[in-house]
From Swiss-Prot:
The keyword Zinc applies. GO terms for molecular function: identical protein binding; zinc ion binding. Residues 362-381 have a biased composition (Basic and acidic residues). The keyword Cytoplasm applies. Involved in the regulation of neurogenesis. Negatively regulates neurite outgrowth. Involved in the morphogenesis of basket cells in the somatosensory cortex during embryogenesis. Involved in the positive regulation of oligodendrocyte differentiation during postnatal growth. Involved in dendritic arborization, morphogenesis of spine density dendrite, and establishment of postsynaptic dendrite density in cortical pyramidal neurons. Involved in homologous recombination (HR) repair pathway. Required for proper resolution of DNA double-strand breaks (DSBs) by HR. One of its GO terms (cellular component) is centrosome. InterPro entries: FBX41/ZN365_Znf-C2H2, GenomicStab_NeuMorph_Reg. Residues 347-392 are annotated as: Disordered. PANTHER family: PROTEIN ZNF365, ZINC FINGER PROTEIN. Keywords: Coiled coil, Cytoplasm, Cytoskeleton, Metal-binding, Neurogenesis, Phosphoprotein, Zinc, Zinc-finger. Isoform 1 is expressed in brain. Isoform 2 is expressed in placenta and at low level in lung and liver. Isoform 3 is expressed in kidney and pancreas. Isoform 1 is expressed exclusively in brain. This is Protein ZNF365. Its main location: cytoplasm.
Length: 407
């Protein structure tokens, strides 16, 4: 049962070497004499992948050759053919058979979990290690024979290979460390540049926000300024309209002032004429009063009354003529005798006594009226100036006539 299971568990490449197994120096301690190997490395590969031995260092060494193809390898059957055993010098240039065995066993062991992850090694290292292993296999094939011990040579060769392998691993580690340091420095540099770029980006973002804030503030100021300009334009338009109205009012007021000035000049001229006429009448009345008083003192009343009547008629005659009365008293011949009756003399004496007390008062009133007429008109008196000027001369004209009548 166990033998059948063992036969089923064998790999296909093991059956191809059963015929030449007797010529190989090394045999598998688990499989027996029917499984033999030409070199120690092939035996280790067989033990590693076919049995339960777990030698990590050997696995690491064997895993350096996964890229080699089976078509490039030379099988042990081809090496053991007649005519091939004598040409041991050419075997060094060919690939060993244990590498082929390792590749085949590795293909059959893909379903199982690998022991460890193997790092990639340089091609020069693979070539050097392969050449050294081939050289060792060739030496082993030439020297090995049935009954010849080669353990010392194998041990020294393996020590040499381990030492060289360790040196190469150290060199590779140093190279990897250098590259890691270089990449670390580049990463630090890129990180610093990235931080600088990020800081610049943050700064530019802040500046952009500040510019946007200023833009919004300026937009608000511009809006306020536009509104103020619109209000000022409206006020300016209203001011211009008001100014035009004021100018029109000023022009109208100037025309009014010109008309008022013309009327004032005319009024002053009329007033001056009236004052001159009034002064003449006052002077004439004073002369008549003086003459009347002088005649009363001398006692010649009759002659004085006749003289006064003749003077009055002579003074009133041009006035009546100027007024255009055709039927005046002075021109009527039948009424002249009415002023000289004897019954009128006593009445005239009483009137003369009363009139002697009133000349000063009349003169004072006339002076006040002339002062009022000469007074400059005020603002409120501009419109009524012509009317007042027309009323006062009429009143002044009535006073001399009354005085004359009293006399």
């Amino acid at each position: 049962m166990q033998q059948k299971a063992f036969e089923e568990s064998r790999y296909p490449w093991q059956e191809s070497f059963e015929n030449v197994a007797v010529c190989l120096p090394l045999r598998c301690p688990r499989c027996g004499d029917h499984t033999r190997f030409r070199s120690l490395s092939s035996l280790r590969a067989h033990l590693e992948f076919s049995h339960s031995y777990e030698e990590r260092t050997l696995l690491t060494k064997c895993s350096l050759f996964p890229s080699l193809k089976d078509t490039d390898l030379v099988t042990s059957s081809e090496l053991l053919k007649p005519g091939k055993l004598q040409s041991s010098g050419n075997v060094v240039k060919q690939k060993p058979s244990y590498v082929n065995l390792y590749s085949i066993s590795h293909e059959h062991s893909k379903d199982r979990k690998p022991f460890e992850v193997v790092a990639e090694r340089p091609v020069s290292y693979v070539q050097t290690y392969t050449a050294m292993d081939l050289h060792a296999d060739s030496l082993d094939g030439t020297r090995s024979g049935p009954g010849l011990p080669t353990s010392d040579t194998k041990a020294s060769f393996e020590a040499h290979v381990r030492e060289k392998f360790n040196r190469m691993v150290e060199a590779v580690d140093r190279t990897i460390e250098k590259r890691i340091d270089k990449l670390t420095k580049e990463l630090a540099q890129k990180t610093a540049e990235l931080l600088e770029v990020r800081a610049a980006f943050v700064q530019l973002t802040q500046k952009k926000q500040e510019v946007q804030r200023r833009e919004r503030a300026l937009n608000r100021q511009v809006d306020v300024a536009v509104e103020m300009i619109a209000v000022l334009r409206q006020r300016l338009t209203e001011s211009e309209e008001e100014l035009l109205r004021k100018e029109e009012e000023v022009v109208t007021f100037n025309h009014f002032l010109e008309a008022a000035a013309e009327k004032e000049v005319q009024g002053k001229a009329r007033l001056q004429d009236f004052i001159e006429n009034l002064l003449q009448r006052v002077e004439l009345a004073e002369k008549q009063l003086e003459y009347y008083q002088s005649q009363q003192a001398s006692g010649f009343v009759r002659d004085l009354s006749g003289h006064v009547l003749t003077d009055i008629s002579s003074n009133r005659k041009p006035k009546c003529l100027s007024r255009g009365h055709p039927h005046s008293v002075c021109n009527h011949p039948d009424l002249k005798a009415h002023f000289h009756p004897k019954g009128r003399n006593h009445l005239k004496k009483a009137k003369d006594d009363r009139a002697s007390m009133q000349p000063a008062k009349a003169i004072h009133e006339q002076a006040e009226s002339s002062r009022d007429l000469c007074r400059p008109p005020k603002k409120g008196e501009l419109l009524g100036f012509g009317r007042k000027g027309n009323i006062r001369p009429k009143m002044a004209k009535k006073k001399p006539t009354a005085i004359v009548n009293i006399i």
